[in-house]
């Protein structure tokens, strides 16, 4: 069935209509209430006249349409207070301006100390009494404007002590000859943290804690046989565990011992590498609101996380009008990383079922036992770190925030209120039923200052098709009054793409997270896919076949395994066998066919090259509604034919469309055989 659809452009007419829309429907609603109260007979006569039903329907449409683009559909923006460059007139101009161009909320980010660079004479120093007056005024004004607000979380604070900060494993090595008694050998202390900076190995007085020491036999005259396994254990000579001798740290009788780094020992004949291993602070720092510079908090310590929250964010939320703050925003990219911390060895043993300490040299790149054992220990360490960050930091911080009636937003972490950041976050949001999915957009120099809406629209469209349905901009873009049309377009797109749930046919499982070629299963093949993790795979709910349901109630038709099953763990293999018995389609070998029709799964959408799409399914009392968002990624006008696989009575829906250069279109289909098409032309250059 072919439909040559009439295109409805979202442009100047819609913008002008929106400007007086709220006043219009409120006025009409007031008239109806007035007549119903003071002139019931007239309103009864009015209602009995069938010709008036069109008026009533129009009024209802006005009310529904005016309420359609709620705050959830509107984009947000970062609001940076840099170098203390803030004043009451500036706050008023920024907030009212951002509200007027259609922003749904702001992320307040005081960054960079005023002393670093003076932007203008009337600036205020961060955390000074005048600064708090500015903060209170911004809360008050945002509250009066009914503007949503979030606060940026920087987990650094002057109150964080070195032993409460992020930790890392450090070590020194010493080469010795065995076969004789070793007396008074100094095993130098590894690097340590002192007074805001890292000290080199051998320095004393800094923060450092020993974990264990080892004597490791090696072959050759100049160095260890394993040649350091940090690149690939598979290409290294593994060290048998019988050639690894633990050295008791505070005395002890395992072939002698070591006290304060001084070794008293006798080793068997041969060449030995002595490893002294411990942990210290990573030295990673951040400033609280641009001034309170301090160490980053240990992500494995709930007590340290609570100390951070109670010392800064809880008092902030208790300020006058502090309830206008509805979100706390965490940016994990700012952290660096840690591989040790509070109770890490104990947590590892409880979770992985064996003691990490005998295998600690693995963290120094020593391939113990075998290449496969080395990789297993490394994977277990990474998994433990992942679990601890999620449970001890994010879940603790989220619980503390919820006690203050505040939600948490962060980048690319699966179990938060609003996950953020591109494809991994899109997949995690689908798996765990989170909506909306945020992405920071156009914050670089190109996007923030040199990019016009005409240049930015193709990039925005591409990420809408990827699955992002709420953008966060830099306020350099949105402070301009001319930004309203662009923001209205984004709001309309986000309004439709936040409805229902995504239609994704394929789940791709890769033990390490991302497959090497993550574009392999996207358009133009006509299918969407999600990356699923081990947690999601093991929780796969196969309540009915042949579709599979994951924890977020997301349907998948096919499970792709991106590496040979022989390399998977026994736990994963058992789960895959269980899924096969339930009829789930599992493909674990290279697949050469152009589609999955042989499994009864036709392409969701068939499009020409250089186009992409997003598909949302809305289940209503009257049936289903399929919302398709199509984008033209070429700088030329195109006449295309799009073919849709729908759940309607039709087998396929074929639509002919005329798309302008970098144009986009919504095609909305329902099981009532209705079709609505909403298109946008290429935005003109200013």
Give the location of each predicted region.
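Acidic/aromatic-lined carbohydrate-recognition and catalytic surfaces
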Residues: 111-256, 265-266, 277, 285-286, ...
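Extended acidic/polar, glycine-enriched regions
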Residues: 232-315, 655-684
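Carbohydrate-binding surfaces of carbohydrate-active enzymes
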Residues: 91-92, 105, 126-157, 163-164, ...
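Mature N-terminal segment immediately following signal peptide/propeptide cleavage
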Residues: 69-97, 101-105
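Short, positively charged and aromatic/hydrophobic N-terminal segments
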Residues: 6-7, 26-29, 33, 37-40
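Bacterial N-terminal signal peptides
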Residues: 56-63
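Bacterial N-terminal signal peptides that target proteins for export
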Residues: 48-55
